[in-house]
Amino acid sequence: MTEKKKEITERLEREFDVCDKHILRINEALEGLGVNIPMSADCYSNLTTEQVRCIDQFIFRFSKLQDSMGAKIFRYILEYLDEDITALPMRDILNRLERYLIIPSADEWTYIRELRNEISHDYPLLETDVAAILNELFSKSAFKGNRHA
């Protein structure tokens, strides 16, 4: 293994460790939420302060996880594969990862990113919209027991 590949491997391992912590906190937030998922708009509007904290933690960690994967891990993987990604936009990076079968779908990753942006940027959304987006994100976060999900 070349020095460059060793360095990339070390960076990947460090980022995987960071992602594992985010996944742990996501799981803790989901456990602490204590509501049936999918969650109705009525359920969402009647959440306790602690449940809202769990949702906030979920959103924060989900965002951090996706940022870490998109900004670092995906790029490191392609670097390791000797891909020139210097000036590539995120969509092209996702397409290459899909081609290598590293992610199942570039479109799905983009869709999840858009959902995450909607929920995390405090746009004025109806409670039904917030509940629907949260349910969709919850369904995309089945991390229990997965290392490097």
Question: Each PLM stretch: what is its role?
Answer:
Residues 2-149:
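Solvent-exposed interaction patches of small proteins and small membrane subunits
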